[in-house]
Amino acid sequence: MKPTLVLVGRPNVGKSTLFNRLTRSRDAIVADIPGLTRDRHYGHGRLGLKPYLVVDTGGFEPVVKSGILHAMAKQTLQAVDEADIVLFIVDGRQGLAAQDKIIAEQLRKTGQKIILVVNKTEGMPYSSVTAEFHELGLGTPCAVSALHGDHLGELIDFALEGYPYEEETAAEPGQEKCPVIAIAGRPNVGKSTLINTLLGEERVIAFDQPGTTRDSIYVDFEYGQRSYTLIDTAGLRRSGKVWETVEKFSVVKTLQSIEAANVVILVLDAHHEISDQDAHIAGFILETGRSLVVAINKWDGLDDYQREIIKREFERKLGFLSFANLHYISALYGNGVKGLMPSVDAAYAAARAHIPTPKLTRAMLAAVAKQQPPRGGMSRPKLRYAHQGGENPPLIIVHGSMLEHVPQTYRRYLENTFREVFKLKGTPLRVEFRTGHNPYAGKKTPLTEEEARRAHSRRRRNRKKYG
């Protein structure tokens, strides 16, 4: 097991910057704004041969008893319970604050191993920058600069000292990868509630306020004896409504998380009509080629008439998602949630399907025999064979002649045929048409010696005859 390091401290002391340094990534959003990180954020790091897990937490406000700051404090305490080592971060430039004393007292009650880390110490002598923090009674402080990376190696060495570790074995060549699932949708549609229902614990903040999740949270879990990684993305809203710079960062992280996923569960709100923004999110998922499962949330409490309206609206506005499995769920009460994971598995398998060339060609020729492509001018396109050109999503390449004249309707006909024959449910499917190259096109055929002699004789006769 990897040791777990949890970063704790009051707002804006540099926890997310330290997280990015320790994981050698830019997975946590960093800006000079207090209260930026709200959920637990997990990342992997390594010092030499020693791997470790790092958990970034929101700014700790233990004295707040209600609202979202209280929920953030609960998240921090849950992370501390999971920790092997707690890195208590304080600000060396601002000095010891009253809130630091309150947090230190709270951490002492947990009984966990605590290391006091004085951040933002670049250019400052150790003795002067750490002197006042001895008052906290947490042992010798470690002075670091997360921004510049100073003394971080010594910090991790000290934190992992005496901790047993095992060398990680490489994955077997045929070993199946862990599917990565992104939960995406507009703000406040119930994405975090859905994750908590799937996990059976309150892992991410579920709060009735749009924009609660600002970062993309990675959570490993097992379901049905299979391992998965879930990503709770920040809610996407129209760019015109993205006022805060931080929220713009969150949108970028959301789009990156969708690109990093194998399967995306698109969550829609049954209590609000399907908007253009829902369609834009779905369009982006398709552009990136990610497999898709659609979940219409908050289905409970609707009567039959309202449900029928929602179904018709989905067909009208999101009909291009007909390839995806559609589920009507209540994330809050768990209704219909169990059906999501089989659809995720099916979509993941379809995206990684390997289809032999003979089978693809037979399916294509059977479709052509059933319905010929329409003529393009004086000639009809000829489809000769098909093969798979890629996966995730599947790419099928059709070869033939005059294929530039194949209309869009016939392309969709072939796509639907391939999807039906090979059961490619839940994944986008791309079909490319390639016309065979004629190496002699636009070139004159050279004359043989005999043909050249006869041509010369004809020209001489014509000159004599016509002067």
Curated annotation (Swiss-Prot):
Q: Which PROSITE patterns does the protein's record reference?
A: G_ENGA
GO MF term set: ATP hydrolysis activity; GTP binding; ribosome binding
Basic residues composition-biased segments: 455-467
The record's section on SMART domains has: AAA (SM00382)
Pfam families, per the entry:
KH_dom-like, MMR_HSR1
Q: Which InterPro entries match?
A: AAA+_ATPase, G_ENGA, GTP-bd, GTPase_Der, KH_dom-like, KH_dom-like_a/b, P-loop_NTPase, Small_GTP-bd
Domain named EngA-type G: which ranges?
Answer: 3-167, 179-352
Does Transport count among this protein's keywords?
no
UniProt keywords, alphabetically = GTP-binding, Nucleotide-binding, Repeat, Ribosome biogenesis
SUPFAM superfamilies attached to this UniProt entry: P-loop containing nucleoside triphosphate hydrolases
Q: Which family does it belong to?
A: Belongs to the TRAFAC class TrmE-Era-EngA-EngB-Septin-like GTPase superfamily. EngA (Der) GTPase family.
Q: What is this protein called?
A: GTPase Der
User: What organism is this sequence from?
Assistant: Nitrosomonas europaea (strain ATCC 19718 / CIP 103999 / KCTC 2705 / NBRC 14298)
